[in-house]
Amino acid sequence: MNLKTDRTFGVPEPGRRYRDRVGAYLVTEHAGHIALIQTPKGYFLPGGGMEPGESAETCIRREILEELGYTVRIDEVLGTADMYVRHETIGWFHPVQYYLRGELIHKVSVPIEEDHKMVWRPAIEAENLLFPECQRWAVACYIKRK
């Protein structure tokens, strides 16, 4: 995958075939707290993988509805990052992630994903809790821009 990103984490190991996964994630704040998704595997920004033909904005709208049951307003693109990692279940993995800033607007449905719980954490704590290094970077960029 040859998408130019703002920041790359890790270095691809020569001779390895990486599984690409493009996704979009939301950074949203309320009263100094950032929304995170708590799962059995750790903390993540709300969002997920893009489906074929989806834009980052469309992906965010779908994922936020599925994970949280909210509609969302997208304000801006914060940046993009990718990572080269060895994932415990996927193997050689290359996530490419778009980060958008926005606001949760209306609760319109019950979340579909039962093991995903939204929690609000102070911005610095949220940055430190996030599992993927690239998502920590996105929150750090958001904090610096404020």
Language-model regions: role of each:
Residues 1-25:
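Acidic, metal-coordinating catalytic segment for phosphate/diphosphate chemistry
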Residues 71-80:
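A short coil-to-beta-strand element that immediately follows conserved catalytic motifs
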Residues 29-67:
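Conserved Nudix-box catalytic region and its N-terminal flanking loop in Nudix hydrolases
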Residues 28, 99-103, 120-122:
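Short, well-ordered beta-strand micro-motif
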Residues 110-141:
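NUDIX/MutT-family hydrolases
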Residues 48, 62, 75, 121-124:
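Structural detector for helix-capping/boundary residues
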Residues 82-109:
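Active-site-adjacent beta-strand/loop module that shapes the phosphate/pyrophosphate-binding cleft
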